[in-house]
């Protein structure tokens, strides 16, 4: 930025030097791009080789307990997870999901096989040719909504990229002052800082900034708009705050029938405290799977087990698991019996029609004796049954403590920019700075920042699982909003102000250092984010394909296993659901950074476009081939999707605010542009607050989930269903993943959905 005073120039340059050390032309962007491209090619080749070695086994092979000879690559990188057995199941196993009939026969439409992969890189063509109908049937409506959200972002970013390269970049590059302080090869010459404060060409940036508001809103509203999806009413109502004396099916049924005599009540279920039973049943499943493995093994007598992890003592595996199974079977039976004596204050009542349920929820008023709270029940699959026993007061206390600790740690102490600042202050860095290759010096900071910022969502996700949310949709929503907020502050807002932590932000406010505002969007700051997005686009997306975190969890589980007989159970347990909360936050953050910097630093947009395209391709592949189905159906189950669309509004709001501040602090000649931008910002905030053009999930009354004929979902946890102890072992236990994971592709009735109902 061309500052009005030399002192401000030196001050801002000093601030920039504390958060990055770029030394070459274009601030290391060519070097970072070259290194990232090389690493991306190597990682893609590694993934392709691993996938080719995996063979055509597919995700459904996980449920085959006889697959003892499978290699680890067959679990993570298998190629043929595309075909579902179209034949109805003839087993007597209890269906783990409401997508099956009461007899346990799947009633979903079988998937159409995709074309087989041909050649080493055939997986790329197969991924690109995946149809929306196939993804919907195979992975669930959440995946279709998520991919549709990304496609709308791609449309916005494509238009912004064209404007940035065709209009803004030539204006910035060709209309600098005669005595230009930037070299022709300097990155600053491509930014808005190249224009003098009194240049009339700055009106181009102002007008484009204002035009971006309707552009983003009109396109992104189609990602929710009339499809504020998965908010439809169901026939089942969840009743909470039931007193201990009323926790009985008969009492609940009679009271509701007395209040609503014209309503036909089909079923009443009481929730029970299954937290201990859930853990014990998971242990039983592990031992049961291991016993079956030993029973079908060719050399059953030679299989040995180590009862203790750090012990050399061994014994016959079949006898050990047989003994442990009998013991755990008795424990589970006793816990099931005791669980029935621990009813919770939650009940589920199913009526005959959606209209009757709507009438009950609308007209029910708590009485003087029974202060019940009625809401539409989430899907049984969306519930964490083992968490329903958590007291609300304890939950809110834990919520406050967890978020306070997260705020102190992530917001004040460990921002990525602070780590770079600390490294730059070390003497050995200053001594070796001239000796280090510029190629390495420009590449490592952004790679390190990307790595540190990638750890933050992991910390947030772990803490949220410890909080024990009641539903998967609420857990994903909480993770998404917190990750987006922390990432936005840590990755964009604080570094853009030349601050390394929120602590520095407070010090700045108390010391009244107004010169800081003049450091907004220095040329080096824009190049920093260009390098950051390049790293996220190439190395970040390639690592998402390889899924090293899941691989580490898998290897650690194998190391903890007492024998190789536990391997089939471990292989089932690694199939988790796609973490929508984290990925929504990451995608929206990069979109926000790109839009905010698109006017001041137009070179950021091509790389942001590359990021969203690669991210969409990688997520498309992983959703179909790597992760289990997701179906967060509840009255507010679509809130995570509609809120992600709403969060895109932050990009244009911050863009207008930043452009207004730049006009204000660059001298008196920009006051007209400043006033125009402030008026536009006020109008935008007013519309977003009172007349939001992006419809919220709660705004529509038209059901988007069609109630189908047949029995309603059974609101009973799997561990309490008939024959649940024995047959629940066919499901992959997700105890290690906080209740996530499944082995069935048809976990929901896909006939409830169509592609048109989940995509604008």
Curated annotation (Swiss-Prot):
Source species taxonomy: Eukaryota, Metazoa, Ecdysozoa, Arthropoda, Hexapoda
Pfam families the record matches: PHM7_cyt, RSN1_7TM, RSN1_TM
Inactivation phenotype: Flies show reduced lifespan and age-dependent motor defects due to progressive synaptic loss. Defects in ability to discriminate particle size in food due to impaired activation of multidendritic neurons (md-L) by mechanical stimuli and the ability to choose food.
Gene that this sequence comes from: Tmem63
GO BP terms in the entry: detection of humidity stimulus involved in sensory perception; lysosome organization; mechanosensory behavior; monoatomic cation transmembrane transport; monoatomic cation transport; monoatomic ion transmembrane transport; regulation of response to food
General function of this protein: Mechanosensitive cation channel involved in lysosomal morphology and sensitivity to food texture and humidity. Acts as a regulator of lysosomal morphology by mediating lysosomal mechanosensitivity. Mechanosensitive cation channel in multidendritic neurons (md-L) in the tongue required to discriminate particle sizes in food: acts by promoting activation of md-L neurons in response to mechanical stimuli. Also acts as a sensor of humidity change in olfactory sensory neurons.
Highest taxon in the source lineage: Eukaryota
Keyword Transferase tagged: no
InterPro entries membership: Csc1-like, CSC1/OSCA1-like_7TM, CSC1/OSCA1-like_cyt, Csc1/OSCA1-like_N
PANTHER family documented for this protein: PROBABLE MEMBRANE PROTEIN DUF221-RELATED (PTHR13018), RE44586P (PTHR13018:SF5)
GO molecular-function terms, A-Z: calcium-activated cation channel activity; mechanosensitive monoatomic cation channel activity; mechanosensitive monoatomic ion channel activity
Any one of the GO CC terms: lysosomal membrane
Tissue: Expressed in multidendritic neurons (md-L) in the fly tongue. Expressed in multiple humidity responsive neurons.
Compartment(s): Lysosome membrane
Recorded topology in the membrane: Multi-pass membrane protein
Segments in the Cytoplasmic topological domain: 50-152, 221-398, 464-478, 547-568, 611-634, 695-760
Transmembrane feature ranges: 29-49, 153-173, 200-220, 399-419, 443-463, 479-499, 526-546, 569-586, 590-610, 635-665, 674-694
Record's protein name: Mechanosensitive cation channel Tmem63
Positions of the UniProt region annotated as Intracellular linker IL2: 228-391
Keywords: Ion channel, Ion transport, Lysosome, Membrane, Transmembrane, Transmembrane helix, Transport
Family per record: Belongs to the CSC1 (TC 1.A.17) family.
Residues in compartment: Extracellular: 1-28, 174-199, 420-442, 500-525, 587-589, 666-673
Keyword Transmembrane helix among record annotations: yes
């Amino acid at each position: 930025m061309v500052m009005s005073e030399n002192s401000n120039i030196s001050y801002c340059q000093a601030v920039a030097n504390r958060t990055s050390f770029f030394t070459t032309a274009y601030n290391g962007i060519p070097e970072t791009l070259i290194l990232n491209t090389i690493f991306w090619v190597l990682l893609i080749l590694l993934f392709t080789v691993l996938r080719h070695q995996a063979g055509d086994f597919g995700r459904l092979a996980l449920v085959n307990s006889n697959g003892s000879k499978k290699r680890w690559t067959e679990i993570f990188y298998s190629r043929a997870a595309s075909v579902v057995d179209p034949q109805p199941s003839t087993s007597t196993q209890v269906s783990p999901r409401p997508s099956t009939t009461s007899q346990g026969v799947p009633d979903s439409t079988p998937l159409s096989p995709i074309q087989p992969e041909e050649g080493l890189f055939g997986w790329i063509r197969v991924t690109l040719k995946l149809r929306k109908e196939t993804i919907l049937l195979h992975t669930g409506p959440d995946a279709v909504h998520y991919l549709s959200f990304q496609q709308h972002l791609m449309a916005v970013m494509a238009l912004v990229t064209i404007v940035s390269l065709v209009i803004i970049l030539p204006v910035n590059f060709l209309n600098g002052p005669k005595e230009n302080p930037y070299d022709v090869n300097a990155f600053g010459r491509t930014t808005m800082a190249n224009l003098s404060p009194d240049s009339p060409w700055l009106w181009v940036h102002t007008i484009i900034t204002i035009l971006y508001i309707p552009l983003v809103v009109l396109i992104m509203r189609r990602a929710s708009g009339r499809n504020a999806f998965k908010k439809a009413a169901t026939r089942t109502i969840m009743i909470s705050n039931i007193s201990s004396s009323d926790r009985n099916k008969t009492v609940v049924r009679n009271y509701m029938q007395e209040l609503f005599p014209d309503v036909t009540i089909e079923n009443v279920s009481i929730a029970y405290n299954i937290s201990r039973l859930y853990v014990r049943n998971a242990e039983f499943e592990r031992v049961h799977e291991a016993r079956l493995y030993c029973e079908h093994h060719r050399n059953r007598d030679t299989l040995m087990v180590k009862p203790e992890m750090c012990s050399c003592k061994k014994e016959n595996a079949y006898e050990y698991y047989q003994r442990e199974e009998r013991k755990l079977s008795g424990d589970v039976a006793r816990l099931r019996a005791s669980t029935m004596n621990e009813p919770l204050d939650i009940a589920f009542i199913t009526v005959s029609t959606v209209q009757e349920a709507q009438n009950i929820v609308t007209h029910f008023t708590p009485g003087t004796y029974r202060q019940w709270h009625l809401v539409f029940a989430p899907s049984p699959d969306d519930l964490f049954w083992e968490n329903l026993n958590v007291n609300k007061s304890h939950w809110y206390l834990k919520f406050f403590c967890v978020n306070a600790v997260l705020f102190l740690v992530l917001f004040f102490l460990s921002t990525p920019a602070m780590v770079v600042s600390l490294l730059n202050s070390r003497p050995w860095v200053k001594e070796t700075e001239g000796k280090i290759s510029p190629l390495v010096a420009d590449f490592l900071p952004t790679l390190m920042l990307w790595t540190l910022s990638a750890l933050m969502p992991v910390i947030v996700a772990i803490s949220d699982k410890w909080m024990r949310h009641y539903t998967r949709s609420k857990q994903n929503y909480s993770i998404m909003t917190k990750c987006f907020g922390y990432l936005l502050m840590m990755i964009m807002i604080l570094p853009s102000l030349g601050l390394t932590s929120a602590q520095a932000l407070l010090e700045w406010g108390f010391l009244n250092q107004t010169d800081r505002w003049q450091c907004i969007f220095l040329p080096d700051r824009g190049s920093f984010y260009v390098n950051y997005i390049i790293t996220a686009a190439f190395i970040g997306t390639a690592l998402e394909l390889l899924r090293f975190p899941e691989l580490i969890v898998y290897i650690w589980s194998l190391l903890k296993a007492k024998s190789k007989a536990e391997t089939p159970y471990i292989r089932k347990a690694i199939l988790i659901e796609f973490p929508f909360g984290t990925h929504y936050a990451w995608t929206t953050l990069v979109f926000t950074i790109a839009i905010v910097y698109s006017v001041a630093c137009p070179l950021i947009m091509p790389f942001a476009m590359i990021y969203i395209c690669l991210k969409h391709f990688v997520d498309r592949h992983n959703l179909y081939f790597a992760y289990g189905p997701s179906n967060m159906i509840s009255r507010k189950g679509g809130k995570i999707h509609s809120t992600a669309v709403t969060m895109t509004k932050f990009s244009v709001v911050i863009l207008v605010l930043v452009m207004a501040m730049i006009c204000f602090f660059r001298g008196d000649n920009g006051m007209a542009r400043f006033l125009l931008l402030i008026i536009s910002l006020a109008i935008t905030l007013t519309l977003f607050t009172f007349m939001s053009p992006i419809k919220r999930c709660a705004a529509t009354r038209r059901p988007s989930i069609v109630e189908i004929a047949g029995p309603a979902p059974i609101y009973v946890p799997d561990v309490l269903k008939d024959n649940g102890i024995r047959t629940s072992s066919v499901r992959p236990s997700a105890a290690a993943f906080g209740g996530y994971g499944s082995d069935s592709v048809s976990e929901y009735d896909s006939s409830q959905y169509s592609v048109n109902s989940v995509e604008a």
